[in-house]
Structures are given as structure tokens and as C-alpha cells.
């Protein structure tokens, strides 16, 4: 009974008391005044400069890495005249490039084009073979390459005999001493003594053997005369033989006569 009395006391006594439970206006106005005003469009608030730089978190500023562009290789005059360029082509062509000759024209042309293609691929791999040849042909009209081309052609030309003698004379004059090579020394003698007479040159030597050797060197026909004087021909040998080759000498006749006289005297005494 007492419990029932307490339950009855907890129940609201009137509808006015029940309406007080839904009365939420007592502190809401104060709470709305304390909260900051938010933007109406719903965008977040801008962070301060300290937050943007990240210094508040102990972080450095953002570093922007810009990738450097590598220079593009070009097929120009400097690349052609460098060691991997035309100088390498000239060296390897002398050692490795061989042609079969007449009757093998097509195979020789194919071998030459293949040789050029391998060289151009090593020199400038970016370009195709036809494009590389067009670039090289255009660069060949420059003054620098034309001068180098003329110099290379002059190097491959065979030298004349006079130029070789001049080189020998220059080398002997620069050395300042007599060369040990007899060919070089003899060539220098002929070139240096062209303006002198043969008698003056032969007179510089005291002995007859040296004079004879110099005269033979200056006059090649003298060697033939010298040989004729040293060696006799068959005709000369026959001409020099005496006619009375089988007849004995006078001394032999006297000896024979004395022997005959002695024989006669011995026979007479017997």
C-alpha cells in the first residue's frame, strides 16, 4: 500500500507540471551567443599564415623540384671532326675495308654502305642512316670541312721523287751529322753536287780507289769501261795468242843440239 502511495506521488499532479519537462529555453540563448559565427556557405575557415607554412608543426617549406632538361646531341661540324667522327672512319677503313674488285661491284658497294652505316650508328644513334647522310652532305659544304677535306686528300697523294730527296736533305741538314745509311748518303751527294763538275768532285778524294769509285757513281757508263778493262773478252784472248804457239824457244833448241852432240861422241868412242 505504501508503494502504491509513492508511485502516485511521483506522477505529475497536473498537465501544467508535464509541460515543464519540455521547456528547453532556459540556457540555449547563452550557448548560441558563445559559439563563433560560422560562414553561411559552409566553406572552412582560412588557416593562418603560420599554419600554411607548417612552422607550427616543425616542418620546412615545400621545396619545388624542377627537372633540368639535358642538352640534345646534334650532328654538327665539331662532332664530325672529333675522334669518333671522320678520323675514326679513315683509320678503320684502311684496316678493315677490303674490296674484291672487278666482277664483285654489287657486293663491294653493299659492303661499303654497311661500313658507313655502322660508323654512323656509333657516331649519332638518334638519326636514321638516310637522315644522317643528308645532314653530313649539308655540312660538307661548309668552309671548315672543305679545308679539312683538301688536307686529307693531300696527305693521301703519293710524293714525287724530288720531294723525297728534299725531305732527305732537310733531315740530314737538321741532324748535322753524316748519315749511316749509304742510300741516303749517296742521294745527298748527288743532290748537293749537281752544280759542280765531275772533275772537281773527283779531285776532293786523294786515293785512286776513292776517285775511281766517285767517277763511277757520277758516270754510270764508266762502270762498263772499268769492267772492260778488268776482264778480257774471248776475242782479246785469241788475238793475244802468238802464231808460233807449238815452236820451242831458242834455249830449248840449244839444249837439244848439245844432247845430240853428246850422243854422237859417245857412239864414236864406242
UniProtKB/Swiss-Prot annotation:
Sequence ranges of Basic and acidic residues compositional bias: 8-20
Annotated compartments: Nucleus
Coiled coil location: none
Chief place where the protein resides: nucleus
GO CC aspect terms: replication fork protection complex
GO molecular function annotation: DNA binding
InterPro entries named in the record: Csm3, TIPIN/Csm3/Swi3
Keywords: Cell cycle, DNA damage, DNA repair, DNA replication inhibitor, Meiosis, Nucleus
Stated role: Forms a fork protection complex (FPC) with tof1 and which is required for chromosome segregation during meiosis and DNA damage repair. FPC coordinates leading and lagging strand synthesis and moves with the replication fork. FPC stabilizes replication forks in a configuration that is recognized by replication checkpoint sensors.
Family affiliation: Belongs to the CSM3 family.
Record protein name field: Chromosome segregation in meiosis protein 3
Underlying gene: csm3
